[in-house]
Structure formats: C-alpha cells, structure tokens
Swiss-Prot record:
CDD domains named among the record's database cross-references: RPS2
HAMAP family: Ribosomal_uS2_B
PANTHER family with a match to the protein in the record: 30S RIBOSOMAL PROTEIN S2 PROKARYOTIC AND ORGANELLAR (PTHR12534), SMALL RIBOSOMAL SUBUNIT PROTEIN US2M (PTHR12534:SF0)
Record's GO cellular component terms: mitochondrial small ribosomal subunit; plastid
This protein's name: Small ribosomal subunit protein uS2c
UniProt cross-references to PROSITE patterns, sorted A to Z: RIBOSOMAL_S2_2 (PS00963)
Any GO BP: translation
Annotated organism of origin: Aneura mirabilis (Parasitic liverwort)
Length: 239
C-alpha cells in the first residue's frame, strides 16, 4: 500500500491532550528528542514527532493487514480497558484488557491449551451440559469459565502468535514488551515522557494516561488496519 496522511491533524491532537507528558522530575532522558518544551514543571510532547511516528505506525499496520497479518492490542490500565475492547472489536483484532499473565506469548503452547479448554467449556454451557451436572460441579465450571472470560476473552479465537502487538502503556505492559522482544514480534507502542522509546519498534510519543489521547490514537491505528483489510479483500476480488 502507498503511504498516506491518515488525516493526522495537530489541532485534533491538541484537543485530545496528546501533547501533555509527565512531570519533569519523572522523565526518561531517552525521550528528549520527542519533547518540545516544559510548562509548569510538565513536559510538552512535540506533536510533529507524534504525527510522524503515528503515520509510520499506520503505514505498517495497513500494509500488514493487507497481507492478512494478525494483531494483538494490549491495554490493561483502567483508563484504557474499555477503549481497547472497542478498538479491537471494530478492527477484528485480538486484545488483552485485563491482567497480562506472564508467558502469554513466550509460553504459547500452554496458553493455547487453556484457550481450547475455554472454548470447550463455552460449548458445553451452550449445549446445556452444565444443567445436567451436580450443583457443586456447575459452580466450579461457572467459576472457571468466568475467570477464563476475564483474562482470555479477547484472545479466545487466537490460534497462533500475533504478527504485530499494539501496546497502550509501555511501563504498565513491560512484561508483554519483553515477551515480544524475546520472540521477535514487532511492537507499536504509545510512549509517554517517562518511557524508553528504544525498546519498541515504532514508538508513538503521546500522553498514555488521558482517555481522549488513548482513544484518538487507537482509532487511527485500527482505522489503518481496517483499510488494509479492505484493500486485501479488493485485491482478492480483482485477482
């Protein structure tokens, strides 16, 4: 796919508060190239840099989607949890919006087995098998199913490791980033002024705390994924 602008406008980014970083005393010096200035002891992110890296991330996402690649969106902080579900659902991506369990990717064979058990339990419930079990077994099965839904609901149909992982908060999801690095899975990550931009493939300098900022950027990324998938379908129809 050809590169495009993705309708990234500085005014919209300012309205979403994407430029507000953390307090100066909390900064990571590696973020210096992405900081415009400081105001009232708070770093202000250079939105020109945000636009540049977000555009690059959208290009990557669209190209990958056009080739049938699979995405995993990770955001477990309370400000992001529901936004992650909405963004992932709209773009048909897998997601994790509760606790990241260690080994989610690096111990994939075990996770895959648990996902199969999850799918089987749901089939049994739908088939009415739970109704024929003793009360204690029903309670145990419901409890297991509830826990599986909480932690694995967003990856229930993920049958292989993702090709690209999109991460909302680098510091919060550092275990996920380490697993991606170990496995060589490319990452796109929002990086606030207290983050390390060098541990992700495409860092997007941005406020990773404000809901408006998270929503605006995740919408751009998932829009690019959707456009890539549409392009893939058009190519299939024309071939």
């Amino acid at each position: 796919m050809k590169q495009k602008s993705w309708d990234i406008h500085l005014e919209e980014m300012m309205e979403a508060g994407i430029h507000f970083g953390h307090q100066v005393r909390k900064w990571n010096p590696k973020m210096a190239p992405f900081i415009f200035t400081e105001r009232k002891s708070v770093h202000i992110i250079n939105l020109t840099q945000t636009a540049r890296f977000l555009s690059e991330a959208c290009d990557l996402a669209a190209n990958a989607a056009s080739r049938g690649k699979q995405f995993l969106i990770v955001g477990t902080k309370y400000q992001a949890a529901d936004l992650v579900v909405s963004a992932a659902s709209g773009a048909r991506c897998h997601y994790i919006n509760q606790k990241w369990l260690g080994g989610m990717l690096t111990n994939w064979s075990t996770i895959e087995t648990r996902l199969q058990k999850f799918r089987n339990l749901e089939k049994e419930k739908l088939a009415g098998i739970f109704e024929r079990l003793p009360k204690k077994e029903v309670a145990d099965s419901e409890r297991r199913l509830s826990r599986l839904r909480k932690y694995f609901g967003g990856i229930k149909y993920m049958t292989a490791l993702p090709d690209i992982v999109i991460i909302i908060d680098q510091r919060k999801e550092f275990t996920a980033i380490r697993e991606c690095i170990t496995l060589g899975i490319p990452t796109i990550c929002l990086v606030d002024t207290d983050c390390d931009p060098n541990v992700t493939d495409i860092p997007i300098p941005a406020n990773d705390d404000a809901r408006a900022s998270i929503k605006w950027i995740s919408n751009k990324l998932t829009l690019a994924i959707c456009e890539g998938r549409l392009n893939s379908n058009a190519n299939c129809m024309n071939s």
